[in-house]
């Protein structure tokens, strides 16, 4: 993408010495000629492609076409594991979503609006809390094996609602 998130990612990567190529729908570097950049070491998705509710969409269909790829950063944070991140995981490529960046941006915005400093340690604390809230535990097993019992206990321990398929159906 070539919007604001892309500009931020580009600035940070270039500050760390990266040679950045920005792809967008139009221009000489676009989604139709991704193969020209098969030597990419890092892919950053700075588009809403893959964001809820269009979770099946992916900005790149075949990550294997990038044999030098060392990491994928998807700035989408909902869902926590987008289609492109799942593809990266399947290939053993380190990957991360944009939730931590969102929290860091919120911290900076809050400081700007309030004029009060906020300790950087709050970023990790809030990120961890949000990540836990976004994750689910799914229990799968044969009838009578204890899924409901274990699920009920986990729901109490984690202070989370229990969605029992037997009760829902």
Regions found by a protein language model. Name each.
Residues 160-169:
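Short beta-strand-centered segment that lines the nucleotide-binding/catalytic pocket of NTP-utilizing
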Residues 1-14, 141-143:
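Glycine-rich adenosine-cofactor-binding loop
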Residues 75-135:
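Adenosine-phosphate binding glycine-rich loop
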Residues 23-28, 166:
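N-terminal Rossmann-fold cofactor-binding loop
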Residues 27-96:
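Rossmann-like adenosine-cofactor binding region
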Residues 150:
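Hydrophobic positions on the alpha1 helix immediately C-terminal to the Walker A/P-loop
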Residues 147:
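Conserved lysine of the Walker
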């Amino acid at each position: 993408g070539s919007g604001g998130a892309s500009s931020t990612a580009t600035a940070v990567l270039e500050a760390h010495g990266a040679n950045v190529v920005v792809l967008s729908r139009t221009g000489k570097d676009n989604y139709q000629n991704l193969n020209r950049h098969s030597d990419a070491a890092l892919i950053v998705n700075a588009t809403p492609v893959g964001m809820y509710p269009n979770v099946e969409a992916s900005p790149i269909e075949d990550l294997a076409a990038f044999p030098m790829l060392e990491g994928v950063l998807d700035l989408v944070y909902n869902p926590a594991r987008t289609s492109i991140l799942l593809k990266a995981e399947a290939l053993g490529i380190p990957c991360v979503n944009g939730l931590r960046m969102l929290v860091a941006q919120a911290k900076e915005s809050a400081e700007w609006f309030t004029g009060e400093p906020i300790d950087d340690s709050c970023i990790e604390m809030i990120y961890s809390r949000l990540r836990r809230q976004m994750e689910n535990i799914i229990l799968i097993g044969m009838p009578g094996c204890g899924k409901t019992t274990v699920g009920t206990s986990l729901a109490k321990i984690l202070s989370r609602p229990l969605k029992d398929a037997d009760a829902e159906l």
